[in-house]
């Protein structure tokens, strides 16, 4: 099929409203929350402030994206890329450049989030000392993660129908494990007579000193729990719905409610923050990860078997997320290819009606990120100069840096999308029905996003080697994108290939 036929081929809508809400809920909720929630209580009762700030920031983003889905419609792939086209147009090279940059930036979130899959096996078994201290076991788990990543690449080529079935299977197991952890958390609360509610909601001896930077860094961490909002706007053409805004808002409400319930339950567990159940000194009964809940609830005989079950569920969570990322990231590349910014073959579909070459492009980018991130363990140790990190700690730092990069890219996208959104509203397009509370939420959210972005781009603490590495990686990938843009300008002589645009 020719490029033009591919470009104008009618889109097969493969998600019903209910399926999309379920897909979106599973895509956003789960992995990020259980990865960061235990760190929230280092600030005691102010942890609820962190949850509130993160939720307010993302609520405004969600409302703006859902509002823009009404203004721009849902006939074409691209999400926030289409928003940039609507705000700036494509008549000048400057407008085309910033429009492309918006689309390129949002396409980077998937590859950086995808890095977590191979490492998640290692972190899942952190409470088993024989694994944590065994380099051979750690390498084996990492290799296993890469093999699973390759298997996911193969599955993702079989189209949304196949992917939906795979994601459903992974999601069922994932939620059994996540909800099982919360139930076991309630059991641990009972065994300690609810002492954790006092321990985690007061500024006790082991709670970190409250400061502006602590609040900012912890809020950024909490944003991981809501990651993926910007990705979902890229696949709206695959959704059969007359009110995509309602779908987004229902999903956000469900995610926030789940997090609030989970937050309350976990705040009642003793032994958080790396300290034992006595709260006096670090020991083996500390709740270091979500998996520790399984480990401690299982006791002497069932602790390791339950931890293995958690590890498998945590892995399936990552597999489901990776499949979802492949779907959304591929469609971001499709939008750029349709306009000629990327090679036209990326827009081709296979017999399963999947953009298979866009899927390969997504996977190649993820592999490139993985290769570059291998540098992280070999960076100079900021804590102990001249001393190399042990393998487990090095992997932990690698995952931490990858998460920080993914959040940073998301913050950049939220910031520039808000700028474009305000430009569109200034033109009085679709703004007649915007209520005052919605406008207020945009203002509060934009302020939160702006502070989080610039404090993380230019931290006012001691500069670390990982800060230099993060900025270098961002510069490298943006340079690659600029290369594609320059090639497109030369090839198409400053004209975009005709494609579907915002209404």
UniProtKB/Swiss-Prot annotation:
| Keyword field | Cell membrane, Membrane, Transmembrane, Transmembrane helix
Q: How does it sit in the membrane?
A: Multi-pass membrane protein
Give TM regions: 20-40, 43-63, 106-126, 138-158, 166-186, 215-235, 249-269, 301-321, 359-379, 405-425, 443-463, 468-488
Main localization of the protein? membrane
**Could you tell me which InterPro entries the record lists for this protein?**
AA-permease/SLC12A_dom (IPR004841), APC_superfamily (IPR050367)
Which is one Pfam family of this protein?
AA_permease
| Annotated protein name in UniProt | Uncharacterized protein MG226 homolog
Gene3D superfamilies assigned: Amino acid/polyamine transporter I (1.20.1740.10)
Localization recorded for this chain is: Cell membrane
Per the UniProt entry, what are the Gene Ontology biological process annotations, in alphabetical order? transmembrane transport
Per the record, the similarity remark reads: To M.genitalium MG225.
